[in-house]
């Protein structure tokens, strides 16, 4: 996810933490490749998880290669990770820990990893393995060199493969509780395309980087021959464009990875459009539609999916945050999708990316109500973890209280181009029909040689009900939806296109009527 407050939201300065002296009883080398479970089997067991955020992923560019690992680990203000900290997560009922890890700062001029850094990462992984937790180990905050363009591909790929070869060798004998994740949110950082679905080129290169990392992992042998490997879409985005363009290598143990801080205006937004409450039938239905899009898209590609990051920030609205947390996890578990809460140990009210749940210095919970809600969400579907409690793919209709079976069919989309009265911009729409709900993807093409800023257009309502959107703001005016961009979508570069996605319910319209002011 976007981390604009990484250094400023460091917490608990001056706290003194001592390494735990607890022994680690589990042997992470005890499972051989022949007994490694499939990715699909593992996903069914991962449950609800927790991110050790802003810790091993602290990107400190002014520290030298030989700086002690602990200086990096605590560089953004978080305390040293201890076994007691991991025990706290385990005892709360979480089943998975994601360990975001930055490696680029620990490569020398020959792209060799610092052995002390590898040793420290293994130590933290071992804390988790000892507690029978699933562990997601990734490459995080590598965007300064993992740049998804054709121009950079030839230089990035060898370095990425060398990095993953070294990581894989270090962990090749760990059992199937360890899951690798090739990349975090690979994207065109600092460009208008960063959080808007990228370009066809960048999405293609992300697929190639994923495949290159997987190839390096498999070549190291041992348990890595069949280890579950997570792979993100472009920017780990759950938009229809990024998911549809996600390519799965010919490998039965791949897991798709998306990040879903949903709904955005409740979960992350701090602007004047922000909302502080959640829980209506409309809210729940919108989230169900979004989760169905993940399930159906990746099911059609033959892979399971994990939501590697989700959560909501502190706006002094704990009750609504807890309600969303429970519903989110329950709905995801019904669809067989594990969710991993992003925790950066920052919990102040109305201070930006305040996702913290556990105070890592005191080992007390900032928000025990939210923690309990997350675990309840899992237990709602798995009350006793019996055979009868396996996740289903039922879709809940919040208005009726009944469930309907997932048809398993996804309309790949019908595409139409509608002439507009604005020669500068043309619009193409593509409809992905899920049955009872749909997603409309609008491609806006700038037909001029100059950038277009602050665009807007109207869509005739025609009995349409739009329910969910992130990149735009929508108001109603004289029988039209008025669509205006969020700040990150205001510019359409010269001779370029952007894509916006709007989800809706009811009648599916194949030919929208557009109008420019």
From Swiss-Prot:
One of its GO terms (cellular component) is extracellular region. This is Endoglucanase A. Residues 408-420 have a biased composition (Low complexity). Hydrolyzes barley beta-glucan, lichenan, carboxymethylcellulose and xylan. It shows preferential activity against the larger cellooligosaccharides (cellohexaose and cellopentaose); cellotetraose is the smallest substrate degraded completely. Optimum pH is 4.8. Its EC number is 3.2.1.4. It holds the Pfam family Cellulase. Residues 1-25 form the signal peptide. Residues 382-424 are annotated as: Disordered. It catalyses: Endohydrolysis of (1->4)-beta-D-glucosidic linkages in cellulose, lichenin and cereal beta-D-glucans. Residues 382-392 have a biased composition (Basic and acidic residues). Belongs to the glycosyl hydrolase 5 (cellulase A) family. Residues 393-407 have a biased composition (Polar residues). GO terms for biological process: cellulose catabolic process. It is an enzyme of class 3 (hydrolase).
């Amino acid at each position: 996810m976007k981390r604009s407050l990484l250094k400023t939201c460091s917490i608990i300065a001056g706290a003194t933490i001592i390494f735990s002296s607890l022994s680690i009883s589990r042997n992470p080398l005890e499972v051989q490749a022949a007994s490694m479970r499939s990715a699909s089997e593992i996903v069914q067991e991962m449950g609800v998880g927790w991110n050790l955020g802003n810790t091993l992923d602290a990107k400190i560019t002014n520290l030298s290669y030989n700086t002690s690992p602990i200086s990096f680990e605590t560089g953004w203000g978080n305390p040293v990770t201890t076994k007691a900290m991991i025990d706290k997560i385990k005892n709360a009922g979480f089943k998975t820990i994601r360990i975001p890890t930055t490696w680029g700062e620990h490569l020398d001029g020959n792209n060799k990893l610092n052995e002390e850094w590898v040793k420290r990462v293994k130590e933290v992984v071992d804390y988790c393995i000892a507690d029978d937790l699933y562990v997601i180990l990734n490459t995080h905050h590598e965007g300064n060199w993992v740049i998804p363009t054709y121009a950079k591909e030839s230089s990035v790929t060898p370095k990425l493969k060398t990095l993953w070869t070294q990581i894989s060798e270090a962990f090749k004998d760990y059992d199937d509780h360890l899951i690798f994740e090739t990349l975090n949110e690979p994207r065109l950082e600092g460009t208008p395309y960063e959080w808007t679905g990228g370009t066809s080129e960048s999405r293609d290169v992300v697929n190639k980087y994923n495949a290159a990392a997987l190839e390096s992992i498999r070549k190291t042998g041992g348990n890595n021959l069949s280890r579950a490997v997570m792979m993100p879409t472009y920017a780990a985005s759950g938009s229809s464009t990024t998911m549809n363009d996600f390519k799965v290598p010919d490998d039965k143990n791949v897991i798709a990875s998306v990040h879903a801080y949903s709904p955005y205006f409740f979960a992350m937004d701090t602007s004047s459009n922000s909302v502080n409450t959640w829980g209506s039938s409309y809210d729940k239905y919108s989230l169900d539609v979004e989760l169905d899009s993940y399930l159906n898209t990746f099911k059609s590609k033959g892979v399971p999916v994990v939501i590697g990051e989700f959560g909501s920030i502190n706006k002094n609205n704990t009750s609504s945050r807890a309600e969303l947390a429970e519903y989110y996890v329950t709905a995801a578990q019904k669809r067989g999708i594990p969710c991993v809460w992003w925790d950066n140990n920052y919990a102040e009210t109305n201070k930006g990316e305040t996702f913290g749940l556990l105070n890592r210095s005191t080992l007390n919970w900032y928000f025990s109500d939210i923690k309990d809600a997350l675990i309840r969400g899992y237990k709602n579907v798995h009350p006793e973890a019996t055979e009868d409690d396996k996740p289903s793919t039922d879709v809940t209709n919040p208005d009726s209280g009944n469930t309907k079976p997932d048809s398993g069919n996804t309309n790949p989309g019908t595409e139409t181009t509608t002439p507009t009265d604005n020669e500068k911009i043309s619009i193409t729409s593509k409809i992905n029909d899920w049955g009872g709900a749909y997603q409309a993807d609008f491609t806006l093409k700038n037909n001029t040689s100059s950038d277009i800023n602050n665009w807007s257009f109207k869509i005739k309502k025609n009995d349409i009900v739009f329910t969910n959107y992130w990149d735009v703001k929508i108001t109603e005016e004289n029988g039209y939806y008025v669509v205006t961009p969020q700040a990150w979508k205001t510019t359409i570069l010269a001779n370029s296109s952007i894509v916006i996605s709007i989800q809706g319910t009811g009648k599916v319209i194949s030919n929208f009527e557009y109008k420019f002011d």
